């Protein structure tokens, strides 16, 4: 019976009172709960329903595959069109220089960055579910691609005799081969992402936890910055890939720093300072500016004009972008023969690209109150990369900087991205050749300034130090592994370490003994809360973890340590007591056998566990004490030898295992708990379980946990039920206020 009582005073606490019997799972299953009867459908009927092709199912599949059909028919022109136009132009203006710059990171000619800023963006408009992210080139992915291209097509493969009988690199042949490798890699990444999307593997992103991703992208920023130093200084060095590539690249730049082109350095530093100032102004006055100041396109146009007018390439030796063909290249089938060499690289690129996209998409979706589908995003990215690869593009993902511009300038839908791609198309078709005199140091400046946001992620370190040491460890391992081992190996190490931290958490959970708050049915950690009082003769143990093969033994060790009850040690002590008692009765003592037995009681001091177990109660006389394996004689009393050895070895008669935090248990864990129940029974301590969820109980039944000596009578829905029943078993009085 249950009723609620509310005091008439305004500040009164709402009270409730429940009167019911003590419930065990045996009673609940037999009397209280009855499962709903469900008639399983025949297998043929289930197959027929699954294969049934109704109009609603077709519509759902089509609309799910082409999300544009869900929002375009109801597109509000008056409210959204102007904002999407402004946003599209702003994003497109930003996408042009970034496409050129990130192509350098991908180790392909700049024009392929423009192709990658058009085709995938156009496709995402039809297949994507996010309204605000900007798909296209991105520094991290471009760098990973470039590493593969340089490995598969190094300069050493394209050495030819120069004019002075010296060996020089055939740039045209090298770039052509690198484009083939990058395009094939993009095709493979697209296939992987598309297949994962069809298999509903959108949940993969959860394994790339935020500290891991932020540490990884910060490390990528270090790699990118180091790779751009040679362009900023105008020195000629080889491109390094793999473990310690950052160290080798820095060493190469420093060895050749005497060859720095001063004009190149001045242009690069000037553009860097200008872009940094513009970035700060845009951030400071973003609420007052209709659109951000397009600093990147300004430096591109101005530096291109100056370079063209002053013939910087010919007169000052400044490296420039070079030939940019006008128009679009015809489609071409990728080179499938290199797939076996690229598969190991394609998997991490596919996963990282998707992780960046879905994290940005979810951020904007949460802000504006709509939902994104992770599986559809995988399909959309896969199609963007796969289809576009036939048109000479490299792998794309969402860009944080462009997405922020697209959102802040009033973008409402994917129409903004569509307009941005059309602006890129206009440049490629009509005026791409204009950017041929553009100094590469300007592109390096654009890249490095855009990395500032990633470097700011180092601010996570003090925050994580205060919040979570384990997450800080993930961040640091991800960062240093990626910096030193390279992005591919670094990501693998970081993911492995993140998984190990999950195992570590389950193996090192918080283990506590619970006590009751007086006059309530609430139980809390006795070490943390002074109001919590242990129940006489009962230990309540809670471990904040599930129980499975990796931590089952640790669970038992923690149980024995926290409760102070080790059945094996208690039984050994009992055997020692018997041995010494027999020796004393057979030896020549000043007291006879009868008087010794009358005065025997035992206190076992288990110094190893740091607790005292009273083995027998009674007036203390000469007795035996077991301390760290040594026996000493003291005085106690007892009635007879039989009574002496039948007394309890510990004042604790019951142990309650709180299973409230346990989400799952495997066969090893179930066997472990069952052995604990049997082991404690040998020293007359009853072990019961409390707080098991219905799912956990179902798992225990499946694992055949309920067989002698374990029965459902030992399982209770709450700790309070278990405490009351344990007291009843020992015929102890139950306080009336805690019924």
Curated annotation (Swiss-Prot):
Residues annotated to bind salicylate: 401
Entry GO terms, CC: cytoplasm; membrane; plasma membrane
Cytoplasmic side: 1-76, 128-138, 200-209, 286-294, 371-373, 410-413, 468, 508-739
Taxonomic superkingdom: Eukaryota
Key words, A-Z: Cell membrane, Glycoprotein, Membrane, Transmembrane, Transmembrane helix
Bilayer-crossing regions: 77-106, 110-127, 139-152, 170-199, 210-233, 262-285, 295-310, 336-370, 374-391, 400-409, 414-435, 440-467, 469-484, 487-507
Function text: Electrogenic antiporter that exchanges sulfate or oxalate for chloride ion in a strictly coupled manner with a 1:1 stoichiometry. Adopts a dynamic conformation, which alternates between the exposure of the central binding site to the extra- and intracellular solutions leading to an inward-to-outward conformational transition during the transport cycle. Generates voltage-dependent charge movements resembling to the non-linear capacitance (NLC) of the cell membrane, but which are not associated to electromotile activity.
NCBIfam families: sulP
Swiss-Prot/TrEMBL domain comment: The anion-binding site in STAS domain is lacking. The STAS domain mediates dimerization, with both STAS domains latched onto each other in a domain-swapped manner. The N-terminus domain is involved in dimerization such that each N-terminus domain embraces both STAS domains. The transmembrane domain consists of 14 transmembrane segments organized in a 7(+)7 inverted repeat architecture that can be divided into two main helix bundles, the ''core'' domain and the ''gate'' domain. The transmembrane regions are domain-swapped with the STAS domain containing N- and C-terminal cytoplasmic domains.
Name of the protein in question: Prestin
UniProt organism field: Danio rerio
